[in-house]
Amino acid sequence: MGSDVIGVLGADMRQRRMDSLKISNWILAGLATALSLTAGAGAQTGTTPQAQAPQTPAAAPATAAPQKPAAPLQLQNMGQTPPKADPFPQANPKYFTATTPTVDTVNAFLKALWGYDPNRIWRVEAIQTTPAPNISKVVVFVSDKTPGSKVQPTAFFVTPDEKHAVAGDAIVPFGATPFADLRKTLQARADGAARGATGKDLLLVEFSDLQCPHCKEAQGTMDNLVKDFPNARVVYQSFPIVDLHPFAFKAAAYGYCVQKQKNDAFFVYSAAVFETQDALTTETGDETLKNAVTKAGLDPAAVDACAATPATKDQVNASIKLAQDVGVEQTPMLAVNGHLLPLTGIPYETLKTIVSYQASLDGVSTGATGPAVGSSSVPPTLGK
């Protein structure tokens, strides 16, 4: 994407490096993948290539007054120790031909995504106009503080309203507080069975499918989050993917009817369904769901009748619509105050760090013991 800027760094710098998270394809994951941006703690290291400055594309003449780049090296706000040497080329004003977004906004956006990692460093090297009216191209160089770490170039586009960033086939929220709108949406509309706190200041919403094998695997993670974050409200939100899982919608409908009678019974029901997930077949699926209802202490016949009503089907469809509206494309997915993260592939300690960091950005307490993540001051920048 953008050979005029990235091509000059050479094939070695374009080589993708696997991040320790190994996240798949949305927001943090999607952006990291789409932007070829996978530097992080524990990432592969090697000789740092000679980074070169971006080249202004001929198709994007400088029609606006260049921005003045911010401090040359931006570090994460959790890090206390700056790198021994500045691995990036100095930002050149001639590559800042677009008036929006500002360098400060881009840095705030990237800190929202990556600030949980104290080892990651970057510099915004260009914010350029493009042939598409009011669509800007942002170029960032990223690395980490491990000696000899490679510099990764990446680029993404920002929409005219500065609400979204586009990278490859990923469209993600953009801005200084990119997850704020999704957080408000989920606070208003996430109505699944819930555990933990009654308040929604720290809201963890799990989008899940009862017939999804990866969702079954994620339940231990969700149980741990409930224990480790006492101030979090943890919501199970149904997102049955019926094209892949024929019994998922009916299982979700049963789940809604169980929740309607008794919130806590839902989690007994869902655990029983996950435990017998392989039996959700044409021959044994109905009996499997009824047995799960019985384990939850409710009447299977009453739940079955409730699940068949148009009102219940509308409720499940509304939950699906919510998932689609906030950009969920796979299960299991976790929204941490609006920040969408795939639940599989993230080490639990890393996930805990991200939850704590997002809470610190939003100014809310997690209730967890130990030092607050993201509470340290921003370390000094280099190269002034």
Give the positions of each predicted feature.
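Sec-dependent N-terminal signal peptides
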Residues: 9, 14-44
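C-terminal cap of thioredoxin/glutaredoxin-like
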Residues: 45-75, 95-99, 107-109, 113-167, ...
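Acidic/histidine-rich, surface-exposed loop or edge segments in extracytoplasmic proteins
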Residues: 82-94, 251-252
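Stable alpha-helical elements in mature extracytoplasmic
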Residues: 102, 106, 200, 218-221, ...
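A generic structural signal for alpha->beta connector loops
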Residues: 121, 201, 231-233
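A short, surface-exposed interaction/processing loop segment used at functional sites
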Residues: 159-193
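A short beta-strand-turn-helix
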Residues: 185-202, 226
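Structural alpha/beta surface segment adjacent to cysteine/selenocysteine redox centers
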Residues: 205-294, 324-329, 357, 361, ...
